Amino acid sequence: MGEASSFVAVRLMRIIPILAILGATYYIFLTCFASFQATDVPVPEEWRNHDAVVDEVDEITETLTHDPDSRPTPHKLTIAEIEDLENKGEFMGFEDEDEIDVFINLDDDGDWEEDDLKKELGDELEGDFEDEEDEDFGDDDDDDDNDDDVDWSRFAYIQYVTNEDYLCNSVMIFEQLHRLGSKADRLLMYPKEMLEPDAAYSNKRGGQLLIRARDEYNVTLQPIEIQHRDGQDETWADSFTKLLAFNQTQYDRVLSLDSDSMVLQHMDELFQLPPCPVAMPRAYWLYNENPPKRILSSQVMLIQPDDVEFERIVQKMNSIGPNDYDMEIVNSLYLDSALILPHRKYDMLTAEFRNKDHTAYLGSEREKWDSSVALSEAKFVHFSDWPVPKPWINDVETRLANQPDCPEGETSCPDRDIWNGFYTDFTDNKKRVCESVGKTGQKWIHWRRM
């Protein structure tokens, strides 16, 4: 008996510490829980009015379920019931004259398919999708912002002058580029005996025009030796000077423009075309000849100056025939490799407004000629209206005798008005830019082209 009591006492002594620890832990837990304060989370308003919402839903459901005018949905109709409704001219709540919207497919994302929407809603949504696409590609303002990153000193419009008679035309081209806001440099190659490039004064009209071009139109003056080759036509004997543009390696690219022309819009965007030795438009007016002459026009040339290319030019100049000039040289070298510029923008002839057939210019027998559209898209227009002389030659009688025809009984029409406008604008520009040189105290008003 005594041994049993002793055994129980020993067991109790071992259990008591464990019970004490458990009790203390439980006490601490109760104390911490009692002092904890829960965050006051507001109850959503719709939960507070749960009963009202449930009642409203029940009321709507009951109305829909027990509406005596409601019709059963298709899956609840029997075939006989469907046929009966069709015979009565009504189905699914629509009368025969009602306009029923077609079903529109959903794409994988659960959105309405664009083609189905356009087919169903037509022009109403056409503009919306176009607006979204335009937003993806940015707007014109973004292009203007990108221009700010371009080093325009790497590019130049280039003109060449062989004598004083053509100097005025070139200065007029540069004045037009200046007025139109072109950002590229302007380079004028001229006979070195006309003026020192840094001269401050000249008592000759040619020198005064060069100074005006330099000081007012930001033109860089480049004295040169005239490149002359004897041939059957002395008019073009000095035109090889134009090819010196291939040697202006101080620039990455130069845009050569014939001076017997008018610039209607600047062409700075051409300097950003993919790299190529030369880019030129087709001489589209020769495509109507029989047989057609498929050659390139040297009236506009985007050139990548290069020593090797210029060496090829010089070699070709030294081996030409008596009837070969600058146009023949560039075609012999680049006809099959030049990048083609669109002539409708960059090399339009004034004679196009006198033509009856515009297929060669439009490049299509189906497109209709619209002189106003042609004028609005053209950036460079070349004076070429045989037998009408060049615009700096005053021969009004010949010009009026060969002006574009108008419908019978009419003295004015778009073709005639635009064509005559080129010549009158040239005359006005010449007076303002060239004939005013050396005169002081006069204010020359900038004209506006029609």
UniProtKB/Swiss-Prot annotation:
Family: Belongs to the GNT1 family.
Motif DXD per UniProt: ranges: 258-260
Record bears the keyword Aminoacyl-tRNA synthetase: no
Chain segments annotated as transmembrane: 15-35
Functional note: N-acetylglucosaminyltransferase involved in the Golgi-specific modification of N-linked glycans.
Cellular compartments annotated: Golgi apparatus membrane; Vacuole membrane
Membrane topology: Single-pass type II membrane protein
Molecular function GO labels: transferase activity
Gene Ontology cellular-component annotations: Golgi membrane; vacuolar membrane
Entry EC no(s): 2.4.1.-
Record bears the keyword Protease: no
Acidic residues bias: start-end ranges: 123-148
Alphabetical list of InterPro entries matching this protein: GNT1/Glycosyltrans_8, Nucleotide-diphossugar_trans
Gene name linked to the record: GNT1
Name of the protein: Glucose N-acetyltransferase 1
Domain of life, per lineage: Eukaryota
Carbohydrate-modified residues: N218, N247
Chief site of localization: Golgi
Keywords of the record: Glycoprotein, Golgi apparatus, Membrane, Signal-anchor, Transferase, Transmembrane, Transmembrane helix, Vacuole
Residues covered by region (Disordered): 122-148
Lumenal side: 36-450
Cytoplasmic compartment spans: 1-14
Organism encoding this protein: Gibberella zeae (strain ATCC MYA-4620 / CBS 123657 / FGSC 9075 / NRRL 31084 / PH-1)
